[in-house]
UniProtKB/Swiss-Prot annotation:
Broad class of enzyme this protein falls into: hydrolase
Keywords: Apoptosis, Hydrolase, Protease, Thiol protease, Zymogen
GO biological process, one term: apoptotic process
Biological source species: Emericella nidulans (strain FGSC A4 / ATCC 38163 / CBS 112.46 / NRRL 194 / M139)
Matches recorded under Gene3D superfamilies: 3.40.50.12660
Coiled-coil residue windows: none
Entry keyword Acyltransferase: no
Family statement: Belongs to the peptidase C14B family.
Record carries keyword 4Fe-4S: no
General function of this protein: Involved in cell death (apoptosis).
Protein name: Metacaspase-1
The encoding gene: casA
GO cellular component: cytoplasm
Amino acid sequence: MHHHHQQPSYGSGYPGQAYRQQQNPYPQYGHPSPQPYPPQNGYSHPSSGYPPSPAPPNGGQMYHGRQPSYPPNQYPPAHGGPTAPPTNPQAFGHGAPQGYNFQYSRCTGKRKALLIGINYFGQKGQLRGCINDVKNMSTYLNQNFGYAREDMVILTDDQQNPMSQPTKANILRAMHWLVKDAQPNDSLFFHYSGHGGQTPDLDGDEDDGYDEVIYPVDFRVAGHIVDDEMHRIMVKPLQPGVRLTAIFDSCHSGSALDLPYIYSTQGILKEPNLAKEAGQGLLGVISSYARGDMGGMMSTAVGFLKKAAKGDEAYQRTKQTKTSPADVIMWSGSKDDQTSQDAQIAGQATGAMSWAFITAMRKNPQQSYVQLLNSIRDELSTRYTQKPQLSSSHPLDVNLLYVM
């Protein structure tokens, strides 16, 4: 586990004041009309860089009035901005069977958020800014994206209520709460600020032989939480068209939700071999999806047993695809292949990702995925060595409008 030595102080640059000055709950919240030109397709190969991003939009109109927990239900057109996400099923392509689809969320439905900030008071490796990160993020979600306070669970180790402490049991319970009863076009949000690390991977599913883990406040007694478990609880149960946005402010968070597609400002860093997964029987085609039958949606992958030798005893484990028909994306500030030395440096950057995300979104709430990735990179570069990564459960058209 890499200890973060100290939290950089944000000084006046952190938009703390701006939170309270905002009268308007939905500044520039809108979906632009479709682009007049066809989307550029520069993403088929890992080697390719991104196409030039479109010009920034001229800003949407302002919003007044709000419904609790739902975003505004009308969107003013913004001319020349990125295209809103398509509403119909999208094919995975790249070797996946015909009919193996995913669906973007319009983020017009219910909104729930889980935010976890751990300073590890009185423990070796105590951190300074994690609870503050969560306060800033929850305020931003509440004021700008219509997440009602009563639809947020906030676990921090400065709270008196034992149920609000970020213990392993409370975190796992809250993860189940977050995804329970989610429907298409809902927008779920997960934020973790605290220690992250790596542990040897037992089921052979990580490229580098390590699983990424997060450390609950009681990890010395209860242990850590592995990326496989977070994926199983928060990604696996989601139907097509449900958005889960995750932001990790921690070391080694590059693949903390075990999402198979990873993008950087340079282009696609990683994508799954879907032809191989299909050959192993991992990609069950969801015919019920084509019929619009949401009930048959839950099992998206046929389990496939794989032998692995551990010492002398051979044991069986289930290998499953990490793709999902849901709309799961994650912003993180570290790479899977970071050496521990890099991680020591990045370790001082706890809070970097959420700070850069909020700062970039405040400057322009109407960006495409690739524009936002570049904006976040620009914000990070003013204070930190880390670079942002955007991971997804499905192939992303990064020229689409980022909605939440």
